[in-house]
Amino acid sequence: MSNEVSIKELIEKAKVAQKKLEAYSQEQVDVLVKALGKVVYDNAEMFAKEAVEETEMGVYEDKVAKCHLKSGAIWNHIKDKKTVGIIKEEPERALVYVAKPKGVVAATTPITNPVVTPMCNAMAAIKGRNTIIVAPHPKAKKVSAHTVELMNAELKKLGAPENIIQIVEAPSREAAKELMESADVVIATGGAGRVKAAYSSGRPAYGVGPGNSQVIVDKGYDYNKAAQDIITGRKYDNGIICSSEQSVIAPAEDYDKVIAAFVENGAFYVEDEETVEKFRSTLFKDGKINSKIIGKSVQIIADLAGVKVPEGTKVIVLKGKGAGEKDVLCKEKMCPVLVALKYDTFEEAVEIAMANYMYEGAGHTAGIHSDNDENIRYAGTVLPISRLVVNQPATTAGGSFNNGFNPTTTLGCGSWGRNSISENLTYEHLINVSRIGYFNKEAKVPSYEEIWG
């Protein structure tokens, strides 16, 4: 069967199922959405094992934690939200808001997150009474298919319409392209090629941009805590989280203290240029990331570079030779490796981060470890980012119980990253909202003198 026929059939089935799902009440919808998250929560260990084995990326324990945290955080965030019928009324404006589904959602998912991304997108889609078709990464299709299979098994127990979640069984660029061109709305999480294809599909699309989180350590902050938080984020799942830390920008006068804090907390620091170059040439080939190091452990990366590191090393920190295009290490490194850079003034720290974003990753995420709110707000105002994560691992930009970012696996990067949104994607992006506007007898109509005076 050709991709054309199979995609066409998936779309037709999804449309039929969507019309049935559209008749569901809020209570019925929420029962289904909760079940999807609970399936991943309950099977976290199995899914984590399958993901590591198939993709050969990441860390089993971190993938278990990710399944638990994301499923719980997403359900906790959306469980009380209205998405069916009248969702809000504003008597003072004489407006009534009515939620309606967008239809069939096409969702491409990355090799780096083959379980939680399908779950997240399915929960958001069905919360809005949409159906969804997942286009998995070809090298993660088995675990993604198993995730969809178990979610569907749970939906069947609940008597849900058949085919509200489907998956492309033979994923390819051609199949993904056709799917995106046939759906009502597209979520593109993955490489730049897929995101570009989504925005070229002729359909409303939500894509993501490349990560390259710059992290500023403010002078006088608790360097030990900063090191702990940054290492926690950088080593998580062997560094494949899109918002995880990439560069540490530290005060020059306390640089040695900052590095000492990193070493004390399990980092291996490299400052001699010859050894740094061994890692540089291992991580990047012709200016592009070496696919062989993505999601690999510190030990594997060190072995590839021909460098011995102490057993138990959590991350590798390399001394950079300059910001932006001066050093390819200032690009995104999807493994537990950081580049360290010095600054004299806080304004210079922000300039260094800016140079690195102009090199790669504009619009995504930054981190700052500081007690100075003026500096925090300055960085948040000046940098071309959608999220500034304060005094916590940058990996929490995707939402956690300790911050206000909406929990998601799709992080919009705004126009900087050539995306349509500069926030975390949620169910709200997958509903249409109609507005009923009554004649407002109580409205005060200002005179032109009042307006222009």
From Swiss-Prot:
GO molecular function: oxidoreductase activity, acting on the aldehyde or oxo group of donors, NAD or NADP as acceptor
Domain of life of the source: Bacteria
Entry keyword annotation includes Acyltransferase: no
Keywords noted in UniProt: NADP, Oxidoreductase
Pfam families, alphabetized: Aldedh
Active-site annotation: C242
Residues given in the record as NADP(+) binding sites: A188, T189, G190, G191, A192, G193
Keyword NADP: yes
Reactions it catalyzes: succinate semialdehyde + NADP(+) + CoA = succinyl-CoA + NADPH + H(+)
EC number(s) recorded for this UniProt protein: 1.2.1.76
Summary of pH dependence: Optimum pH is 7.0 for the reduction reaction and 8.5 for the oxidation reaction.
Function according to Swiss-Prot or TrEMBL: Catalyzes the reduction of succinate semialdehyde to succinyl-CoA. The enzyme is specific for succinate semialdehyde and succinyl-CoA, and only shows low activity with palmitoyl-CoA. There is no activity with NAD(+) as cosubstrate.
Complex and partners: Homodimer.
PANTHER family: ALDEHYDE DEHYDROGENASE-RELATED
Protein known as: Succinate-semialdehyde dehydrogenase (acetylating)
Organism, as annotated: Clostridium kluyveri (strain ATCC 8527 / DSM 555 / NBRC 12016 / NCIMB 10680 / K1)
The organism's taxonomic lineage, starting at the top: Bacteria, Bacillati, Bacillota, Clostridia, Eubacteriales
Gene assigned in the entry: sucD
